Each structure stands twice: as structure tokens, then as C-alpha cells.
Regions:
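Hydrophobic cores of alpha-helical transmembrane segments in multi-pass inner/ER membrane proteins
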Residues: 1, 70-78, 131-147, 232-241
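Membrane-interface helix-loop-helix junctions at boundaries between adjacent transmembrane segments
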Residues: 55-136
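N-terminal signal-anchor/start-transfer transmembrane helix
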Residues: 1-19
Length: 283
């Protein structure tokens, strides 16, 4: 009798292991298809961005082109991170924003801001570096938003919090999205790794802009709102990294710093161009 029970347990254990392996293989195939789909979108979006911005007539840029390029960088980073972490919970949010941003240049075509810059390899490198930094920080900001929602979700489940829009969201359909995200500690680690990489590129972009502004404006340095906001954002991100490494700043406070720093970075160019192009109708 004991032998029969033991054999049944062994069979059940092997069946369970086989089912788990089958689920794992199915999940990996599903992830590969998602990665392939994202790669195709990246190629199409990237070609469109390059053709829209680097034209034979000159460098065409505006807030719509900036958002579209920022979304492309964000999706690229998501695609790279997707090989190492399961970030499917971020996919609907990131793809939704990327689709919206990719069509903005059709409505807001921008304007030629320089006929010389398009022929300068050095300025192209500065331009690409700056926009990659924008996209990386955008990715970090989205992670900060989702981390805030994750944290609020954990608290809301304990006390059934419906006193705020965030509490209502995470108790509703948004909780399904959050369940697909990695644990908070992994999300936080990825976020700070991303910010570290973005800060290095932002440093190069901010200080190389001093030299390449000569191409656009004929002066090595222009002190205007864009310069001030860019330097302020750079200092805020640097302060955030310093506080994280030295005093262990993390969690909700770190997420607030990320969102605040990125908001200032947006004001440096995209915000000002939006006001000029959409509100004031000036190119």
C-alpha cells in the first residue's frame, strides 16, 4: 500500500514538473514573439524619425519630433531590458505613449532650426546623445510612476484606500497591470541603473552643447530658460544619485525626485517648444 502511494506521488510530481516546463517554454516563446514585434516597430519608427529630422534642407525639430524620438529611445531601452527582466506590465503604457507620440509630427511638423547642423557630424552626435538621455530619463520617469502605483497598491489592499485617484486606479483594472510587473526592489534597481546611464549621457549633452551652440547661434553659450532648466535638471538627477548611493534614498521619496527632475528636464526644451508652436503659434 505504501509503495502504491509513493509511486502515485512520484507520478504526480513528474507530471507537475512536466507541466511547469511546458508553461516555461510557452512563456519564453511568447516573450520572443513580443520582442520580435517590438523590434519591428523600433526599426520602422527609427527610420521615420531620422527621415523627419535630418532632411536635405536642414535639421527639422520641434516638440513633436522631440517626443517621438524620446518615445523611440524609451521603447529601445524597454526592448533591451526585456531580455533580462520580465517587464510586460509596462508594455501597454509604453507602447500606448509611443504610438501617440510617433504620430505627433504629422500634426505638428516642426520647423527647420538649422541648415548647418545637419552637415555637422559633431552636432549630430551631440543631438543624438541629448535625445537618448531624454528617452532614458523618460523611461525612468515611467518606472517611477509604476513604482508609486505598486507601492500604493500594496497599501490600498491592506486598508482598501479609495480616498484618491491613485487608490481607485490600483484597486480597479490597473491592479492587473501591476501584477505583471517585477517586484518593487527589482524595479527600483533597474530604475537607478537607467538613471545612472542617463545621467552620464545628460552630462555629455549639457556640456557639449556649450561648444555646438556656436553652429546654431554663433555664440558658445546662451544663458536662457533652456540652459537654466537643463543645468537644474542635471543637478537634480546628480543629487538624486548621490543621495541614493550615500544615504540610501529610495522608495516613494526617490520616485518623487525622479518625476520632479524629469519634469524640469521637459521644460528645458519640449515644454518651451510646445508653448511656442501650439499656444503662441510661433516656429
Amino acid at each position: 500500500m505504501m509503495i502504491v502511494i509513493h509511486n502515485r506521488r512520484m507520478v504526480a510530481h513528474h507530471d507537475q514538473q512536466g507541466a511547469e516546463r511546458e508553461i516555461t517554454l510557452t512563456s519564453k516563446k511568447h516573450q520572443l514573439w513580443i520582442q520580435l514585434f517590438i523590434l519591428i516597430l523600433l526599426v520602422l519608427h527609427g527610420v521615420a524619425c531620422y527621415q523627419d529630422i535630418f532632411t536635405p534642407e536642414g535639421l527639422v525639430f520641434g516638440f513633436a519630433q522631440a517626443l517621438s524620438l524620446m518615445a523611440w529611445v524609451c521603447i529601445t531601452l524597454f526592448w533591451i531590458e526585456g531580455w533580462f527582466f520580465t517587464l510586460h506590465g509596462m508594455l501597454p503604457l509604453i507602447l500606448g505613449l509611443a504610438i501617440i507620440f510617433s504620430f505627433l509630427p504629422v500634426v505638428f511638423p516642426g520647423a527647420i532650426i538649422s541648415t548647418k547642423a545637419v552637415h555637422s557630424p559633431g552636432f549630430k552626435l551631440h543631438f543624438i546623445t541629448a535625445n537618448i538621455a531624454y528617452g532614458i530619463m523618460f523611461f525612468a520617469a515611467l518606472q517611477a510612476i509604476l513604482m508609486t502605483m505598486q507601492d500604493r497598491s500594496l497599501r490600498s489592499k491592506q486598508r482598501k484606500d479609495t480616498s484618491s485617484w491613485m487608490g481607485i486606479l490600483v484597486l480597479g483594472s490597473g491592479s492587473r497591470l501591476l501584477e505583471q510587473l517585477p517586484p518593487l526592489l527589482i524595479m527600483e534597481r533597474v530604475m537607478f541603473n537607467v538613471i545612472g546611464m542617463g545621467f552620464c549621457l545628460l552630462t555629455v549633452a549639457v556640456f557639449s552643447g556649450v561648444f555646438f551652440s556656436q553652429i546654431l547661434f554663433g555664440r558658445p553659450l546662451i544663458i536662457d530658460h533652456k540652459t537654466i532648466f537643463a543645468l537644474l535638471s542635471w543637478a537634480m538627477f546628480g543629487g538624486l544619485l548621490h543621495a541614493h548611493w550615500r544615504v540610501g534614498l529610495r522608495g516613494a521619496e526617490a520616485s518623487k525626485w525622479v518625476l520632479g527632475s524629469f519634469s524640469v528636464l521637459l521644460l528645458a526644451y519640449i515644454g518651451s517648444r510646445f508653448v511656442l508652436e501650439v499656444i503662441l503659434h510661433r516656429l
